[in-house]
Swiss-Prot record:
Alphabetized Pfam families for the sequence: GcpE
Entry similarity comment: Belongs to the IspG family.
Gene Ontology biological process terms, A to Z: isopentenyl diphosphate biosynthetic process, methylerythritol 4-phosphate pathway; terpenoid biosynthetic process
The species this protein was found in: Salmonella typhi
Protein name: 4-hydroxy-3-methylbut-2-en-1-yl diphosphate synthase (flavodoxin)
Reaction(s) catalysed (UniProt annotation): (2E)-4-hydroxy-3-methylbut-2-enyl diphosphate + oxidized [flavodoxin] + H2O + 2 H(+) = 2-C-methyl-D-erythritol 2,4-cyclic diphosphate + reduced [flavodoxin]
Annotated NCBIfam families: ispG_gcpE (TIGR00612), PRK00366.1 (NF001540)
Function: Converts 2C-methyl-D-erythritol 2,4-cyclodiphosphate (ME-2,4cPP) into 1-hydroxy-2-methyl-2-(E)-butenyl 4-diphosphate.
Cofactor: [4Fe-4S] cluster
Annotated residues for binding of [4Fe-4S] cluster: C270, C273, C305, E312
Family annotation (HAMAP family): IspG
PANTHER family: 4-HYDROXY-3-METHYLBUT-2-EN-1-YL DIPHOSPHATE SYNTHASE, 4-HYDROXY-3-METHYLBUT-2-EN-1-YL DIPHOSPHATE SYNTHASE (FERREDOXIN), CHLOROPLASTIC
UniProt remark on cofactor binding: Binds 1 [4Fe-4S] cluster.
SUPFAM superfamilies reported in the protein's UniProt record: Dihydropteroate synthetase-like (SSF51717), Nitrite and sulphite reductase 4Fe-4S domain-like (SSF56014)
Amino acid sequence: MHNQAPIQRRKSTRIYVGNVPIGDGAPIAVQSMTNTRTTDVEATVNQIKALERVGADIVRVSVPTMDAAEAFKLIKQQVSVPLVADIHFDYRIALKVAEYGVDCLRINPGNIGNEERIRMVVDCARDKNIPIRIGVNAGSLEKDLQEKYGEPTPQALLESAMRHVDHLDRLNFDQFKVSVKASDVFLAVESYRLLAKQIDQPLHLGITEAGGARSGAVKSAIGLGLLLSEGIGDTLRVSLAADPVEEIKVGFDILKSLRIRARGINFIACPTCSRQEFDVIGTVNALEQRLEDIITPMDVSIIGCVVNGPGEALVSTLGVTGGNKKSGLYEDGVRKDRLDNDDMIAQLESRIRAKVSQLDEARRIDVLQVEK
């Protein structure tokens, strides 16, 4: 691969969500949110575990009622990934989930109650070492800011965020991160740019209500990609009207594309044409599903003919170049073997898993040598 200089990330303070470090150069955390009824403990636990299997670092859970808070207690006991409780309007729910071991509170100080109630929540968070996320959203901007600016603008979102930041500052609380989300890509991007210049707290990125699986992924890739390429962002969520598992997959794909954080197989595949010597699309789709369990970073190129195949294979960990009846297999840029086109999926899966084992063993030996 081309040796692109690493992105210089914005300097930010360090907080922890559970055991996950956020900010100050820590890996950008990928998170999602459950869409089950929180009171359905079994369904919510199953979804959280599914998110964890595909790499979720943090999972947010909506806690709108006291019944949901009681369910949260049971959920927390059954999962290991850090949980963020999403809370609005009722400060007592925040106090209750804090008692039950929540790892982070997502609140807006402006809608959680009066000054005394805000102080109670912040004091509780401080006592239990629980960070807070201030979540500003263009769709729920304060009425006076709507009237002042006429519509959601970057300046309006910034002013809203700074109100809440100043509120926590007055309470001498600095364990928080901030988001300024909007469904419009340009509005969100410019809002984050302004905020990044104003504070040194970690920033949680997201294009809110981005849309369905395809359109939402595109909008998120553009918006988050712009910010991440400028070094802005410490955690992210890809918001999709789809299975939350897809949010995690797309989030990691965005980070992989920018070479910020790699997880699992990075497939490089041609869009196919009449020159393809085997079913490239079917092969890629099948392998993506079969190899979801792999977390070891690896580039695998799957090209259907010899036009671009050899060149891509030279810079991939493993590469396949389509040929008549048999296709060339490259390993670390060197042609090693030929695979039967009629049995491509099974053969390539076997080779990939063998290479993963080899890489994992090499890393294990390196770690042992360092420890000695």
